[in-house]
Amino acid sequence: MSPLPRTPSARERISLQNWRERPQSTFSFHNVREFVGTQQINKSENPRHLPVDLISKTELQQAAKLADLDDFLIETETDALTILKNGCLAFDWRADHYPSEKPHIVFSISKSITGMLAGQLQHAGLLHPDRLVRDYLPDMLPEGYGSCTVQHLLDMQAAIDFDENYLDTTGAYVRYRIATMWNPPSDAAPKDEDLRTFLLSLRCSASSHGKVFRYLSPNSDLLGIVLEQAGSGRYADLLSEYVLGPLGCAHETYITVDRAGTARAAGGICLHPHDLARVGQGILDAIISGENASIPEAWIQDTLSSGNVSAWDNGEFSGLLPQGNYRNQWYISDRETPCLLAIGIHGQWLYIDLKRQIVIVKLSSQAEPVNEALDAKLIRFFSQIAKSIG
């Protein structure tokens, strides 16, 4: 008898070549370690309980001024929507394809979490953001990253000759992704080049450091390496000890690593939406109480008030947040009545309304890496919810 023809499963159709494409991403974004090397981040020994005080879907729908909330979330390719109000779980929604306990990649929200780690190491006296990168990493050359300060990395003001082009298939950005092991090897990159070697190869642009906001993910990956040197430990261990553990993160968490074990601090953190909400709530708690085991008050005040307004106004994202700013790897929505935002490609959001004590997490498997019109629409969506239920 002839064997029956075998039909490949949905999982078998996903590879390192296509894991960030939809529909593959509806599986891969919460199963990243099946495709990329990872390091575990230990969860808290004292997980934070989230009290439940739910609002109904109808209430949230009315608050957001939507005809149908489910339709909106599906249309915007949402995987999870979690809302905290005054520290309580107020709303929790999942797409059918996203199991509730799986960690989800948050892409560049990782940068903001890395910024929190930098703040904690600074508070401990281990990191000095005004020092040059080469003070921590002597192999970083002055004609490259060695000539900028750690604060330039934190604020996306390093003048480096690099183009953040997510759709690049032949240039420096695809070489960067191959170095992080997010893309399969190809002729676009030297054989066996790792992340640190790639970062060493980058050179300064014609501009000066500290003048203009220019969003470059390599800045944050290099920041992660600086933090390892300053904190005398691996990134994942430092993050668990100084940030996620004290904040009471309760679920499995991990970060992608390259072939040398270097963490992808710019975009590789995978965590549960409730734990991302705990990160946001930790910031609110620190503002309310003036102190927090993981988030120094001085770091929060510096983040809210010390950004370079001129650099932001002359930068590439000022159209999205015309009255905004960027400091310590966090977006500030409005300089007068600030909300803090952490944003990742393919639709990852952490929105913290400081005045109304609202935290909103939206994780997605959005087909496009960046959709500026949708980003603006979602900021209005978050703002409307916070104003209505806060």
Which positions does each model-derived feature cover?
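Active-site SXXK
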Residues: 87, 105-130, 153, 223-227, ...
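Non-transmembrane alpha-helical segments in soluble domains
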Residues: 70-73, 119, 134, 151-154, ...
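Active-site-proximal alpha-helical segments within enzyme catalytic domains
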Residues: 156, 218-226, 267-288, 348-364
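Active-site Gly/Thr loop motif
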Residues: 250-254, 304-359
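Short, charged, amphipathic alpha-helices and their helix-cap/turn boundaries
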Residues: 88-93, 134-135, 169-209, 233-252
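Structured C-terminal helix/loop/strand segments within mature extracytoplasmic catalytic/sensor domains
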Residues: 1-12, 339-390
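N-terminal leader/targeting segments and the immediately adjacent pre-domain N-terminus
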Residues: 1-99, 126-127, 154-155, 159-164, ...
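Active-site helix/loop module of the DD-peptidase/beta-lactamase fold
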Residues: 105, 123-166, 201-204, 218, ...
